[in-house]
Amino acid sequence: NLSQTPYTNWTVKQADLVTYRSEGFDLVYCIGVLHHLQDPAAGFRAVVANVRPGGRLHCWVYAKEGNGLVILLVEPIRKIASKLPWRVNKYLVAAPLALFFFFYAKLLAKAVPHKVFSRFPMYSYCRWIAKRGFSFFHHVVFDQLVTPQTEYLERSTIENWLEDSRIDPSSTYILMRNGNSWKFGGRAT
């Protein structure tokens, strides 16, 4: 929440990411958008284009790594559910799936950390999300199912994006978050 920081000159922009052009921001923060675009790489290029020289960019996307179960089971459901009326999707599709996910995550969170459990699908993510209540799980599952497009991105794709000549190579970072997503960024030249 930026209102709780000393920064006084900030703006939240909501626009078509791929076509939006600005004079450049000190920070462009793009979370959960790129992986839903028809062309995620074009979206990333737009992020970079909207950072002023010396400014920073930070992005977060779904990883291909660590999401095998989601890709195998949830993606086929999403392709159908995303075409349904949102209330049907939210309450008749997402809610039952969220209930299963809720209990699975809570079970993994209660398990004593052990090498065997760490091999369960989405172990790290489940231990993180298990701290939340059911409504958060429901929101996450619905968010996963409502979008018409999702692309799970490999680390190598992110590495290639960060080779953009407009980004200082010494400033880049890629971190796996919760075993199933990438957070990454750098400083514009």
Predicted regions and their residues:
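Conserved SAM-binding strand-loop segment of SAM-dependent methyltransferases
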Residues: 6-18
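SAM-dependent methyltransferase
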Residues: 84-148
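A short SAM/SAH-binding and catalytic strip from SAM-dependent methyltransferases
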Residues: 26-40
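C-terminal lobe and adjacent flexible extensions of AdoMet/dcAdoMet transferase-like proteins
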Residues: 125-189
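Short alpha-helix adjacent to the SAM-binding motif of class I
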Residues: 1-5
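A short glycine-rich, Lys/Arg-flanked "PGG" loop and its adjoining helix->strand segment in the class I
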Residues: 41-56
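A short acidic, Gly/Pro-enriched loop at the edge of an enzyme's catalytic core
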Residues: 18-28
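Conserved class I S-adenosyl-L-methionine
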Residues: 56-99, 117
